[in-house]
């Protein structure tokens, strides 16, 4: 797979303006293919350091191709292990950190990973392939009530109960094995509005459940603020209301505690020019804060 053809980092200019990297230690907590890391490196001083972290082994592999620099260290880990990873590197404090949330294009374009509507591969959606829970388990083993709750809480899906009932009915005949089977089931069950595929929010909800994304995000944000030096900055890009709500509430709580100064009273949005070049950026929301 040629990552250069599929990966366009989102809101790079705005992230760099907020982080304002130069000297010190910076962390890209969602390495992906290394787009944001590369932009940070271009601004980083010769004695600066950049730590790239991702729970996806393939992200580490691809990022290694473009981040061949003595200032860079890459590690496979989830948000909740942020402090542990840095401790192993004898790093107690950092000067900036970026979180670019959600699924990466690298994962979406790899049909074998089971993230795409069109994939004929088995339902998977694990960002970390060593984790036991898969999308297949959620779809074929969870009871109706739990499916409904996940679809509502993580996907803001108005037809959550109807879709959950149809999944239960269908799997009574045969297991739902592939992403395409699930996408087709949802498409037949609910009306389509606009250009968005009707299964978009369902896939999002299942992915969040499989990867414990909200729990990991809260842990990552907590550890990040603890690790920041005074004046250090945190940037978070989210792509749907649930993620953004977690980030917004966390920033407010930390501001009330006197730990953080919010730099973005309202989230920054991608420019019309960026969205035209990279449609996947259209739902991005960027929030930033500075450690007090």
UniProtKB/Swiss-Prot annotation:
Reactions this protein catalyses: cytidine(1402) in 16S rRNA + S-adenosyl-L-methionine = N(4)-methylcytidine(1402) in 16S rRNA + S-adenosyl-L-homocysteine + H(+)
GO biological process: rRNA base methylation
GO molecular function terms attached to this record: rRNA (cytosine-N4-)-methyltransferase activity
Keywords from the UniProt entry: Cytoplasm, Methyltransferase, rRNA processing, S-adenosyl-L-methionine, Transferase
UniProt-listed Enzyme Commission number(s): 2.1.1.199
Homology family: Belongs to the methyltransferase superfamily. RsmH family.
PANTHER family: 12S RRNA N4-METHYLCYTIDINE METHYLTRANSFERASE, S-ADENOSYL-METHYLTRANSFERASE MRAW
Protein name in UniProt: Ribosomal RNA small subunit methyltransferase H
Gene encoding the protein: rsmH
């Amino acid at each position: 797979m040629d990552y250069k053809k599929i990966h366009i980092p989102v809101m790079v200019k705005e992230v760099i303006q907020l982080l304002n990297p130069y000297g010190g230690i910076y962390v890209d907590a969602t390495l992906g293919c290394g787009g944001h890391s590369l932009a940070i490196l271009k601004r980083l001083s010769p004695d600066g350091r950049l730590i790239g972290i991702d729970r996806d082994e393939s992200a580490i592999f691809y990022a290694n191709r473009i981040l061949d620099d003595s200032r860079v260290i890459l590690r496979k880990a989830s948000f909740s292990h942020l402090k542990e990873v840095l401790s192993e590197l004898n790093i107690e404090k950092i000067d900036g950190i970026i979180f670019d949330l959600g699924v990466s294009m690298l994962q979406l374009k790899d049909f074998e990973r089971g993230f795409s509507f069109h994939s004929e591969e088995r339902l998977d959606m694990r960002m970390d392939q060593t984790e036991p829970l898969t999308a297949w388990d959620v779809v074929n083993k969870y009871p109706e009530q739990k499916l409904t709750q996940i679809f509502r809480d993580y996907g803001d899906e108005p037809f959550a109960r109807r879709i959950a009932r149809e999944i239960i009915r269908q799997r009574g005949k045969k297991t739902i094995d592939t992403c395409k089977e699930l996408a087709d089931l949802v498409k037949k069950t609910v009306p389509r509005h606009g250009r968005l595929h009707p299964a978009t929010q369902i896939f999002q909800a299942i992915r969040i459940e499989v990867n414990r994304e909200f729990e990991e995000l809260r842990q990552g944000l907590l550890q990040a603020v603890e690790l920041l030096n005074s004046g250090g900055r945190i940037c978070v890009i989210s792509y749907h209301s649930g993620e953004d709500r977690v980030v917004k509430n966390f920033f407010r709580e930390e501001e009330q505690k006197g730990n953080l100064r919010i730099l973005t009273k309202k989230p920054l949005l991608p420019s019309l020019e960026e969205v035209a070049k990279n449609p996947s950026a259209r739902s991005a929301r960027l929030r930033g804060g500075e450690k007090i």
